[in-house]
From Swiss-Prot:
Signal peptide span: none
Family: Belongs to the tetraspanin (TM4SF) family.
Glycan attachment positions: 100, 109, 117, 134
Major site of localization recorded for this protein: membrane
InterPro entries (alphabetical): Tetraspanin/Peripherin, Tetraspanin_animals
Membrane topology summary: Multi-pass membrane protein
Lineage of producing organism: Eukaryota, Metazoa, Chordata, Craniata, Vertebrata
Location(s) in or outside the cell: Membrane
The protein, known as: Tetraspanin-31-A
Any one cellular-component term (Gene Ontology): membrane
Topology Cytoplasmic: residue spans: 1-12, 66-72, 197-212
TM helices/strands, residue ranges: 13-33, 45-65, 73-93, 176-196
Gene name in the database record: tspan31-a
Ranges of the Extracellular topological domain: 34-44, 94-175
Cystine bridges: none
Length: 212
């Protein structure tokens, strides 16, 4: 049977949703592993990653059930959700790729200010640094963070602040994040196209007089 047929479309849609399920389970597993080993202590970060994993898992399950049973309603819901996810993910990915250094600094500074002391201390220990950025505007907060910091720098003259360390890798990280996001956003468009095509194909094993 050619690849445009019913069986091929069904198998391709099932395979795509199995990949989504594996990615969702991977996100949940990595978040649980990070929390269990104390790599990330913030419940908000852990909860966010797990929520994304569960959401992706649910979408994949809906798509998989819809593909296996050729369920019209489930396939329609699957297409609508994937389109909404694509729009959001495409905008976020493009924003990551377009973000310059001053915008990165503003974003990281805002995020740092909203962090709890526990999360800041955890980051300082992981990155081996103290404080965010030693600038005139943030001098008071920087001194406060340094006073609470437990990391001891072997050479104070060569020590970078956490902001400097994060900004050194932020550009590369954002490009990777944006690129991966764009890749997955186009797989979502592929999923919508496969679901639409499969939804409008007739099951050769079904009653010839039945509607799709």
């Amino acid at each position: 049977m050619v690849c445009g047929g019913f069986t091929c479309s069904k198998n391709a849609l099932c395979a795509l949703n199995v990949v989504y399920m594996l990615v969702g389970l991977l996100l949940i597993g990595v978040a649980a592993w990070g929390k269990g080993f104390g790599i990330v202590s913030s419940i908000h970060i852990i909860g966010g990653v797990i929520a994304i994993g569960v959401f992706l898992l649910l979408i994949a399950i809906i798509g998989l059930i819809g593909a296996v049973s050729h369920h019209q309603v489930m396939l329609f819901i699957y297409m609508v959700v994937l389109i909404l996810v694509f729009i959001f993910q495409f905008i976020v990915s493009c924003s990551c790729l377009a973000m310059n250094r001053s915008q990165q600094e503003y974003f990281l500074n805002t995020t740092w200010r909203r962090m709890s002391n526990e999360t800041r201390l955890n980051l300082e220990e992981t990155l081996e640094c103290c404080g965010f950025l030693n600038t005139t505007e943030a001098r008071e907060l920087f001194n406060k963070d340094v006073a609470l910091c437990s990391h001891v720098c072997p050479d104070p003259h060569k020590c970078l602040s956490c902001g400097d360390k994060m900004l050194n890798h932020a550009d590369e990280a954002l490009k990777i994040l944006g690129g991966v996001g764009l890749f997955f956003s186009f797989t979502e468009i592929l999923g919508v196209w496969l679901a639409f095509r499969f939804r409008n194909q007739k099951d050769p094993r079904a009653n010839p007089s039945a509607f799709l």
